[in-house]
Amino acid sequence: MPDRGGENGASCSVGRWSAEEARAIYNLPFNDLLFRAHGLHRENFDPNRIQLSKLLNIKTGGCPEDCGYCSQSASAENGLKASKLMEIETVLEEARKAKAAGATRYCMGAAWRSPKDRDMPALTHMIESVKAMGLETCMTLGMLDSDKAEKLADAGLDYYNHNIDTSERFYPAVITTRSFEDRLDTLANVRNAGIKVCSGGILGLGEETEDRIDMLVTLANLPEPPESVPINMLIPMPGTRLAKAAPVDPLEFVRVVALARILMPKSHVRLTAGRTAMSDEMQALCFFAGANSLFMGDTLLTAANPGDDRDSSLLRRLGIQAETEQPA
């Protein structure tokens, strides 16, 4: 099978990867798959450095979307109360703490279908102020039209996160209030505004292996692949439609990380939700397969996260350093 990574693992162009090609790679013997993924990882990144990111929930709950996995959906039966948009100084204080703890990327998330005009001045102020601290900025605010994307770009936003979640085929089983095409439209608006794209998906929604492969093929075959690809493992949240979802096989999760690295060799592949359920050994395999970013802290939106102490211990044992640290 030819190595479709291109010269030095260059990213693929439109339509480059077929589902059949991706499936053949995914189904390689496990060691062969990881060997290929790790080789591309080394060509494009330092395998012993990782980016630490911090995610802050700047507006919690009350989202009108019906995403079956999300505790912040208004349809979730969990008693979560909607909050107002966080005060700017509180956001900045949390950003200072994140930077002091080693984060180089700061993501701000709001539980909205899309941001309203009245919220844009506060959002742009947050972006400008966080960037002034020397942090890379990211926001995830729901759908964006071209005008709002331009406003965020003008404020200096580095990344916008908007996951496609799963394959187009399986998507309607998870969400009915916004279409798969709506998500792709937002990604196009973000890209056209000159903001880098952060988009990935969630494993454990009830999807098949084919859906996981197709999700990654969709992302890899965008006009420009996302610079950032978060791979989430579902945390079943009480009160959501997927509260009793079956767990994901750990080795299948690692395979998805490896496939993401192969299809999008120049992208940051981010281990995001679900790490509290992952063993240290599973996370180590993910890093070997090409994951090179994680979210620090005790919480991730409304879900638990391993916390800085466990992460520091794991990275130290693996000899992996944060991007802000000086090599030993």
Swiss-Prot record:
Its cofactor is [4Fe-4S] cluster; [2Fe-2S] cluster. Pathway: Cofactor biosynthesis; biotin biosynthesis; biotin from 7,8-diaminononanoate: step 2/2. The keyword Transferase applies. It comes from the Bacteria. GO terms for molecular function: 2 iron, 2 sulfur cluster binding; 4 iron, 4 sulfur cluster binding; biotin synthase activity; iron ion binding. Residues 48-275 form the Radical SAM core domain. It holds the Pfam family Radical_SAM. It catalyses: (4R,5S)-dethiobiotin + (sulfur carrier)-SH + 2 reduced [2Fe-2S]-[ferredoxin] + 2 S-adenosyl-L-methionine = (sulfur carrier)-H + biotin + 2 5'-deoxyadenosine + 2 L-methionine + 2 oxidized [2Fe-2S]-[ferredoxin]. Binds 1 [4Fe-4S] cluster. The cluster is coordinated with 3 cysteines and an exchangeable S-adenosyl-L-methionine. GO terms for biological process: biotin biosynthetic process. Its EC number is 2.8.1.6. It is an enzyme of class 2 (transferase). Keywords: 2Fe-2S, 4Fe-4S, Biotin biosynthesis, Iron, Iron-sulfur, Metal-binding, S-adenosyl-L-methionine, Transferase. [2Fe-2S] cluster binds at residues 107, 138, 198, 270. [4Fe-4S] cluster binds at residues 63, 67, 70. Belongs to the radical SAM superfamily. Biotin synthase family. Catalyzes the conversion of dethiobiotin (DTB) to biotin by the insertion of a sulfur atom into dethiobiotin via a radical-based mechanism. Homodimer. This is Biotin synthase. It comes from Brucella ovis (strain ATCC 25840 / 63/290 / NCTC 10512). The gene is bioB.
